[in-house]
From Swiss-Prot:
The record marks 258 as: Important for activity. The keyword Oxidoreductase applies. Changing residue 194 to N: No effect on Km for manganese. Increases Km for malate 8-fold. The active site is at 91 (proton donor), 162 (proton acceptor). NADP(+) binds at residues 144, 238, 291-294, 325, 397, 443. This is NADP-dependent malic enzyme. The record marks 340 as: Confers specificity for NADP. It is an enzyme of class 1 (oxidoreductase). It comes from Columba livia. SMART domains: malic, Malic_M.
Amino acid sequence: MKKGYEVLRDPHLNKGMAFTLEERQQLNIHGLLPPCFLGQDAQVYSILKNFERLTSDLDRYILLMSLQDRNEKLFYKVLTSDIERFMPIVYTPTVGLACQHYGLAFRRPRGLFITIHDRGHIATMLQSWPESVIKAIVVTDGERILGLGDLGCYGMGIPVGKLALYTACGGVKPHQCLPVMLDVGTDNETLLKDPLYIGLRHKRIRGQAYDDLLDEFMEAVTSRYGMNCLIQFEDFANANAFRLLHKYRNKYCTFNDDIQGTASVAVAGLLAALRITKNRLSDHTVLFQGAGEAALGIANLIVMAMQKEGVSKEEAIKRIWMVDSKGLIVKGRASLTPEKEHFAHEHCEMKNLEDIVKDIKPTVLIGVAAIGGAFTQQILQDMAAFNKRPIIFALSNPTSKAECTAEQLYKYTEGRGIFASGSPFDPVTLPSGQTLYPGQGNNSYVFPGVALGVISCGLKHIGDDVFLTTAEVIAQEVSEENLQEGRLYPPLVTIQQVSLKIAVRIAKEAYRNNTASTYPQPEDLEAFIRSQVYSTDYNCFVADSYTWPEEAMKVKL
């Protein structure tokens, strides 16, 4: 056990002025703190007052991240006290701004920075990390950060923010989480010229050297932390994201949140929307604006969900259309990747999205291309003309990249549109006086619960069925009252309960399918998983002190 000033410098141990007098004396920190004793609730109040005093979301982000560096328990106590308020600060949309200014906001290193020049030595670098038990890693190479593109080493803000939500929303213990940046350079000329840039100052290394780095990283991580260590890939460029997922998914315990997590939350929204449209998913025609990893991930999970309804895979694929930067994806068109070719149909080539919407007449329109304003007034009005209750998801992040706003959607569909977005939007009051609360299809509904479930049962590999199961659980947690208010997702205040239910369901299916590795199987799975959840309450550091009977303590001469 640390003592003295080291206790106050360790965010895992530090309680600030919540240390009792006895703790201060026993830990040799008496006199290193003001002669004041504050409870955790008073400390939360102090942080909230400072938070409210700030006017910039970036400054609020820095305030909270500084707190995480000082007092971990208090940081998570603050986050969980009002998750709906703080999630947009520690994650989307503010984390995107924080990544763009990461050099300016950088205070204290958090996570592991591994570069292309460290090949052959990654195992040694992992030994430098102070924690010997790591259950979850979020790793990025910074090439496709949200909808902002290549931010290189500045992308470290994403794994840090993601893992904060692993704990705040899922209860995964923070000391068992490790954010990792794989720095192979950046093609962002602005960053290469930025005097505050904290990463390697050269163009991205690609090809065999890049693949060798990834292979070594995966082998080193599992050698150090075990084959059941969860490795989440985050914000890799499209080409690498699919390739690496296919390469590693059956060898390691891994998933890609941009492909599979986004798919799960989008399908959850669609399943909830079906309770409004009163039909089946396989009755719908889906059009995607975008054909990257998010779109393809959603499309593949929709196919799986339609198959579960009894439709063949071929029939399900016929109901899905995609538009990329070159237009409608059709058979015979040039520049189609194998993943896109999967959803190419016999149709003439078309480029304009408004014309495509008029021609295809989709019942579901999903935007994941990070093109702000792509869903024009004409498109929204056409969707309302084709459908009694059009389903329109503007899932691109951050807010500036959203295909349309909630207000535009409700206005141009005359309040009939069923809406979900990737970033938060304020409630909208219709001319009728009804107030609608746009559903935010945030991946944070998915990955914390998935992580908790996977870690709790020691799941060996994470298949797409896990994400369809997760989508079903999320949709089931949406009440009729939520739907009447325009919400396609459970209120964020319930996200910890939702994550727990996801974890329990994943673990149950893992034990049923013999894919779990934590044995013996707990008799009460929910109670077992609850026992694994992180507590934000302070630990007591007073030594266990007691006395013996006086006769037993007599000194014999």
